[in-house]
Amino acid sequence: MSTKKRRLLKVIILGDSGVGKTSLMNQYVQKKFTKEYKATIGADFLTKEIEVDDKKVTMQIWDTAGQERFQSLGSAFYRGADCCVLVFDVNNAKSFDDLDNWRDEFIIQAGPPDPDNFPFMVLGNKIDENGGSSRQVSEKKAKAWCASKGSIPYFETSAKEDINVEAAFTCITRNALRNEKEEELFMPDAVDMNTTATQRKRAGCC
């Protein structure tokens, strides 16, 4: 009886300070939420073992500091990433406007071979805040930005109320696995002559 190979996926979470990156990570991995998180210094990560589409996966989720003074640490943390999650607070327009900077910073620091097809994900967090009355970024506006960047999958989330957190990270995992498989098609030492290569396309939502 053969043993399934376990894949290690490195996921980077980026966004301004205070948008809920640490809360999302902890809600997904540990199923808990607290308001007492201290600001992340540098970077931290948690791991979670899951099975998606009959594949065993170890998720290594990196939560990086949102402060500009820590962006210079990026190259060491971003390299080898299989997926990048961009997070903004729907109640903070500036955090949404800064997504362009975070995406560009990741591409510069991580240097993915095919940036246009690298699996990004965008999460609009804190949709529960004040019953939605303090919202500054509409779902329509967020989806339009994602569409302009190559149809990046978008989820609206609440780390506090555990809304869409599991679904978002499951989609993240699938897109990262799909990207990993497609990249293998371009690696001479990884070509399986018995496998028919499927047409490459932008990873969508699950």
UniProtKB/Swiss-Prot annotation:
The gene is YPTC5. The lineage of its organism: Eukaryota, Viridiplantae, Chlorophyta, core chlorophytes, Chlorophyceae. It comes from Chlamydomonas reinhardtii. GTP binds at residues 15-22, 63-67, 125-128. GO terms for molecular function: GTP binding; GTPase activity. It is a lipid-anchor. This is GTP-binding protein YPTC5. One of its GO terms (biological process) is protein transport. A lipid is attached at residues 205-206 (S-geranylgeranyl cysteine). Gene3D superfamilies: P-loop containing nucleotide triphosphate hydrolases. Protein transport. Probably involved in vesicular traffic. A motif (Effector region) lies at residues 37-45.
